[in-house]
């Protein structure tokens, strides 16, 4: 390919809408063009990158016996309603684009394809003899992001590889899950990325277990917690840990103390010389579920800890057997709108009476009560007395007559001790999610009645796994991790071109002929090569080559008359003056191929 035919359009200035460096470089390098918020055109350079990533993915999955298919992007609402996800994906903060056809039937543009593939498999697979099976596709997905940003990192239209496996039993599912985890590690390694695999929350996809593959980068949206020895890692949404014991409050006779205007943990501690770890703080939440009902929730946690909203939402969903569409803290204004005026915020205890909800206009009439392990482990504590300006001291859970759901809803944080080894502590880094794998179990096969006949001749539900890779996001993540002040530094395996040849002076016949000779030889040897044949200054060509990030640069310049060219490595910034044969030998060694 010649630059004169490439439609290359680079920018020197940083685009105003691009917040992170990878987004800036992709726009400046002419890789993407913004059409509207969260929607981009993949220009020829990026399309070559995406095709190379796709090729690596397809090759690796084929070695695992996966079958490639292409599923419809438009999906009927009926199967999503059967799985229980239609409302959660189309209402509130749901991410599915939905529409109606001419007959008034509701459809959705697929953000994911669990329902569709499960329906297809249920109509196709009938016996254990046909299992296991693993099917994947690579296609454009759609998500109505609340706040699309960071270019391809969080866009409304993107390319994704999603795979779905079906099994006769849990052991077989776990075996394929392990195979796919290994395949992902191979894929990301071949793409030249530094990544970590961490435990993750299953989110709206659901299932028993899941892991994320994260490219480590300071601009990453996710906070990852990793043990010092590297044996444990998790997204903070999922992470578990051991907290410090804190300053224990020795048991004594329970009593009530006056605490005027001491609504916060800090105020309570400063006025009374308490420690936050001696306090049970209670927060009121409101959970909105897919049945359109609103459930008040009282959450108790140790005063020096934070609530993990994801864990809390999951616990409520599990308890109610309903999807939580939204969860948020209740404020005094919310209470007033419900006609409730006597809740003493800042002085609430775990035993706040349900009677206060009797007059509510649109909420359920009882609190769901949840206590984090950190609070439940306290034998003696301070908490609100449910009366303004009053707290209880030396209180204990035996004195509280309301039933609490006990679970882990605490946000693990850096410095916490690790579950697997108390001598290890959690350390933090930020990451960009590029892959996610799930053990779904029978979640979808039961809701969609996808069954098969097992070895005993009994009808049973299929076991299922799903596995996603963000292809377009991976491309930008590679840039976020591989760049310098001059531009992109593509890993060789996914670079749009492996080599760029620059003719320093297009009017110099020696330079032009030598460059053309090298160009043709590289093409003959199937090297992905770009020839910069523009009638432009050499400095402009060098800057463009650095910006677009081609791994190897050959310059036919002043020494061309002697048959010598400069061979420059974009990553190491080393330059050698070599003759044609030496260049070809050097590149063949670097590409680990037969002699060029």
From Swiss-Prot:
Keywords: Aminoacyl-tRNA synthetase, ATP-binding, Cytoplasm, Ligase, Nucleotide-binding, Protein biosynthesis
InterPro entries the record matches: aa-tRNA-synt_IIb, aa-tRNA-synth_II, aa-tRNA-synth_II/BPL/LPL, Anticodon-bd, Anticodon-bd_dom_sf, Pro-tRNA-ligase_IIa, Pro-tRNA-synth_IIa_bac-type, Pro-tRNA-Synthase_IIa_type1
GO cellular component terms, A-Z: cytosol
Annotated catalysed reactions: tRNA(Pro) + L-proline + ATP = L-prolyl-tRNA(Pro) + AMP + diphosphate
Top-rank EC class of the record's enzyme: ligase
GO MF: aminoacyl-tRNA deacylase activity; ATP binding; proline-tRNA ligase activity
EC number: 6.1.1.15
Keyword Transcription found: no
Pfam families with a match to the protein in the record: HGTP_anticodon (PF03129), tRNA-synt_2b (PF00587), tRNA_edit (PF04073)
Subcellular location: Cytoplasm
GO biological process: prolyl-tRNA aminoacylation
Taxonomy, superkingdom: Bacteria
Oligomer and partners: Homodimer.
Family as reported in the entry's similarity comment: Belongs to the class-II aminoacyl-tRNA synthetase family. ProS type 1 subfamily.
Free-text note regarding domains: Consists of three domains: the N-terminal catalytic domain, the editing domain and the C-terminal anticodon-binding domain.
Biological role stated in the UniProt entry: Catalyzes the attachment of proline to tRNA(Pro) in a two-step reaction: proline is first activated by ATP to form Pro-AMP and then transferred to the acceptor end of tRNA(Pro). As ProRS can inadvertently accommodate and process non-cognate amino acids such as alanine and cysteine, to avoid such errors it has two additional distinct editing activities against alanine. One activity is designated as 'pretransfer' editing and involves the tRNA(Pro)-independent hydrolysis of activated Ala-AMP.
Protein's recorded name: Proline--tRNA ligase
């Amino acid at each position: 390919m010649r630059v004169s035919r490439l439609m290359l359009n680079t920018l020197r200035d940083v685009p105003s809408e691009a917040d992170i460096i990878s987004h800036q470089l992709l726009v400046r390098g002419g890789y993407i063009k913004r059409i509207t918020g969260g929607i981009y055109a993949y220009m020829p350079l990026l399309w070559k990158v995406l095709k190379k990533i796709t090729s690596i993915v397809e090759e690796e999955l084929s070695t695992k016996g996966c079958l490639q298919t292409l599923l419809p992007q438009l999906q009927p609402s009926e199967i999503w309603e059967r799985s229980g996800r239609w409302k959660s994906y189309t209402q509130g903060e749901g991410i599915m684009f939905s529409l109606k056809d001419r007959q008034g039937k509701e459809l959705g543009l697929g953000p994911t394809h669990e329902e569709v593939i499960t329906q297809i498999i249920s109509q196709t697979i009938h016996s254990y003899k046909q299992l296991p099976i693993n099917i994947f596709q690579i296609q454009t997905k759609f998500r109505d992001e609340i706040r699309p940003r960071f270019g391809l990192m969080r866009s409304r239209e993107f390319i994704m590889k999603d795979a779905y496996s079906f099994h006769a039993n849990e052991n077989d599912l776990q075996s394929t899950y392990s195979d796919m985890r290994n395949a992902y590690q191979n894929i990301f390694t071949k793409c030249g990325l530094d990544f970590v695999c961490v435990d993750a929350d299953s989110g709206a996809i659901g299932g028993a277990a899941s892991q994320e593959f994260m490219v480590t980068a300071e601009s990453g949206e996710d906070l990852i917690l990793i043990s010092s020895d590297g044996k444990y890692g998790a997204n903070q949404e999922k992470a578990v840990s051991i907290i410090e014991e804190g300053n224990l409050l020795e048991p004594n006779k329970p009593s009530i103390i006056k605490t005027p205007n001491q609504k916060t943990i800090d105020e309570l501690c400063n006025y009374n010389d308490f420690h936050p770890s001696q306090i049970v703080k209670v927060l009121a939440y409101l959970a909105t579920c897919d049945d359109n009902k609103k459930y008040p929730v009282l959450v108790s946690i140790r005063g020096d800890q934070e609530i993990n909203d994801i864990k809390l939402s999951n616990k409520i969903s599990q308890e109610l057997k309903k999807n939580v569409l939204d969860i948020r803290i209740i404020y005094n204004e919310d209470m007033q709108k419900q006609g409730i005026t006597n809740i003493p915020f800042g002085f609430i205890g775990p035993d706040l009476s349900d009677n206060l909800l009797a007059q509510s206009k649109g909420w359920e009439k009882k609190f769901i009560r949840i206590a984090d392990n950190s609070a439940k482990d306290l034998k003696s504590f301070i908490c609100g007395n449910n009366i303004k300006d009053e707290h209880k001291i030396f209180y204990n859970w035996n004195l509280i007559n309301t039933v609490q759901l006990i679970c882990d809803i605490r946000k693990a944080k850096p410095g916490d001790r690790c579950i697997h080894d108390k001598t290890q502590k959690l350390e933090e880094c930020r990451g960009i999610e590029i892959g996610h794998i799930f053990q779904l179990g029978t979640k979808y096969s039961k809701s969609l009645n996808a069954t098969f006949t097992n070895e005993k001749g009994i009808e049973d539900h299929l076991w299922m796994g799903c596995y996603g890779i963000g292809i377009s996001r991976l491309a930008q993540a590679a840039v976020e991790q591989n760049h310098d002040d001059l531009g992109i530094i593509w890993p060789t395996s996914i670079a749009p071109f492996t080599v760029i040849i620059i003719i320093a002076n297009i009017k110099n016949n020696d330079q032009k002929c030598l460059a053309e000779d090298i160009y043709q030889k590289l093409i003959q040897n199937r090297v992905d090569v770009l020839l910069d044949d523009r009638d432009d200054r050499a400095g402009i060509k060098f800057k463009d080559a650095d910006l677009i990030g081609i791994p190897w640069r050959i310059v036919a310049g002043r020494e061309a008359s002697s048959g010598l060219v400069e061979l420059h490595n974009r990553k190491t910034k080393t330059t050698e003056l070599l003759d044609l044969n030496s260049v070809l030998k050097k590149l063949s060694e670097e590409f680990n191929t037969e002699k060029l």
